[in-house]
Amino acid sequence: MRVTIVTMDSHLSAAAARAHRALAKQLPGLELTVHAASEWGDSAAALQACLEDIQRADIVVASMLFMEDHYTPILPALQARRERCDAMVCILSATEVTKLTRLGRFDMQAPQSGAMAFLKNLRGKHKEGEAGGSKATAGERQMKMLRRLPKILKFIPGTAQDVRAYFLCLQYWLSGSDANIGAMVHFLVDRYAAGPRASLKGLAKPPEPREYPEVGLYHPRLRDSAHSGGMTRSLDELPSTATTGARGTVGLLLMRSYLLAGNTAHYDGVITALEARGLRVIPAFAAGLDARPAIEAYFMKDGRSSVDALLSLTGFSLVGGPAYNDTKAAEEVLAQLDVPYFASYPVEFQTLDQWGASDRGLLPVEATMMVAIPELDGSSGAMVFGGRGSAGKVACSGCDHRCTFENTPDSHDMHSCIERADMLASRMGRIVDLRRARRADKRVGLVIFNFPPNAGNTGTAAYLSVFESLHNTMTMLKQQG
């Protein structure tokens, strides 16, 4: 039995490898391969290996393939394999990919079935005049419905059972720990293995999707039997190192999927660096790509901010993700929070040593997703703080440390850049100090137009009274201390 997973989420590779080892005893002869779309841009061999695995896979899972550069190279291979494999599950992807889903009698290319019509009725409609703030809970409502649907569909015979399987796969994936990735593969094999592979059915019962906090907190020193993956829902359970910083408090936003996959070294480095600067750190996460639930739960109290600065390490916009963003919603929550907002990012589509040796630095897709889009929300101070390692022993030339971010082949583990994490912590410390300083102790620099220089252009601007505005601004600053 050959199962191939193709996804943008390179950080799931190590989790899938652990899942494969756990499944080896339950499903003898299982081959599980994972391919990260982020590798194809600079590695023709990686793309070719993916195409070959798709061509011989018995079950194919495709996820997070919404960028044309990611799905276009493999779309013909997926289309060719669709009718020849036991099952194909395509989730959270572009329409061209998603419609290739085929699970038993559930075919997304077939005319709408009774089961799908039933699901549309369950979905409900947005009521006209409904408060705009309700959008903040849209993701929460969708997750509740996702958990509820398999329970409802369980009692409907026929195609509905295959539709139920599709939604169970979504549940497994969205809580993508190694346990859930393994359970998803086990579930698909147990239900859809055909021909000589059918002997694998019924060897062991696949577990139900394991649930994890959808909104919560994380800390690297919170790893014990009571806190799966270092996660908790309670501020009181954070270790003392995270709560005793007298200098000030930084609210940290993390990606839940990295925490579930156990791929957190890049986050751990930043958390440690911030704490070493005497800062209290509250590392929070939310399911999906809407950070508002985490902000409201852990960074605000009685409608007011309880942090001195907000730092996002997700690499995405505050509300939305790589495929879309809701700038207006982000502006609303940031105005309510009213603290400096910074967005830093790991390099996702190249390794750290490739980035360090590059004259260009960020790739165009990284500059767009991780810098430009978050800046539309109001973020500033964009900088790299970590990224993927390399399978080869290549020293990163991005700074004088010349670190070797070595990974085992195909693990795609993340790492923290020592110099960058320390620089980021230093900047956040100074921002917190500035926010907490008395107004009389703050120094403000004003820069006005003067180009080209030495040509009498100082403070010139069409239809603007630059010097009058400057004088009024300075007068108001003095009046306010």
Protein language model regions, located:
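An N-terminal assembly and electron-transfer interface module characteristic of large anaerobic redox
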Residues: 1-481
